[in-house]
Regions:
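Small beta-barrel nucleic-acid-binding modules, primarily SNase/OB-fold domains
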Residues: 1-157
């Protein structure tokens, strides 16, 4: 991992979106291959306690820190956010979210080219231990349904 550029985290938007100082301006970054429950959705019904937990964890871990970005595939999404794996102190924070059960391994837009095995294993362990979303039967059902859908949409790419 090249540490050529480190970016300062200016603001944590929610569990899987942060804003950083990127080449002199504020840019939002959507963390790749993770999807934490909503905490900041305009439709309040979408916001759930586990989303708040994920957002608070990201806040505690990343706010004010310098992070590395690693891109894979497209650099921006349709909302103009950068798409990247975020590393803090050399650790893949996307992997950490999956390890802690704060996010499933999010494959709606394809699998990770580089971290597929690690992400799968982290999710398997988190599920086995009933961590985070996997400790809530309703959320588990929801994510298992979504994951089978994602599997189909990823194949259709």
């Amino acid at each position: 991992l090249s540490s050529a550029a480190q970016y300062k985290v200016l603001h944590v938007c929610d569990g899987d979106t942060i804003s950083i100082n990127y080449e002199g301006k504020e840019e939002r970054v959507r963390l790749l291959r993770v999807d934490t429950p909503e905490s900041n959705h305009p439709d309040k019904k979408q916001n759930i306690p586990m989303g708040k937990t994920a957002a608070e964890y990201t806040e505690k871990t990343l706010a004010g820190k310098s992070v590395d970005l690693e891109f894979e595939g497209e650099r921006k999404d349709r909302h103009g956010r950068l798409l990247a794996y975020v590393f803090v102190d050399g650790k893949n924070y996307c992997l950490e979210l999956i390890e802690k059960g704060l996010s499933p391994y999010y494959t709606k837009y394809g699998s990770s080219k580089k971290y597929d095995q690690e992400f799968k294993e982290a999710e398997r362990q988190a599920r086995k231990q009933g961590l985070g979303i996997w400790g809530d039967p309703e959320l588990t059902q929801k994510y298992l349904r979504l994951k089978s859908k994602w599997g189909q949409s990823a194949k259709g790419h």
